[in-house]
Amino acid sequence: BZIBYKMGHFRWGAPMDK
C-alpha cells in the first residue's frame, strides 16, 4: 500500500523513499 512507502517499509526487500 502507499502508506507503507511513507512509513519507510521495505516491502520488496529494498528501501522505498516514495
UniProtKB/Swiss-Prot annotation:
Primary site of residence = secreted
What is the documented function of this protein? MSH (melanocyte-stimulating hormone) increases the pigmentation of skin by increasing melanin production in melanocytes.
Q: Which GO terms describe its cellular component?
A: extracellular region
The compartments listed are:
Secreted
Molecular function (GO) terms listed?
Answer: hormone activity
- Protein name, UniProt field: Melanotropin beta
Keywords (A to Z) from UniProt: Hormone, Secreted
**Family indicated by similarity:** Belongs to the POMC family.
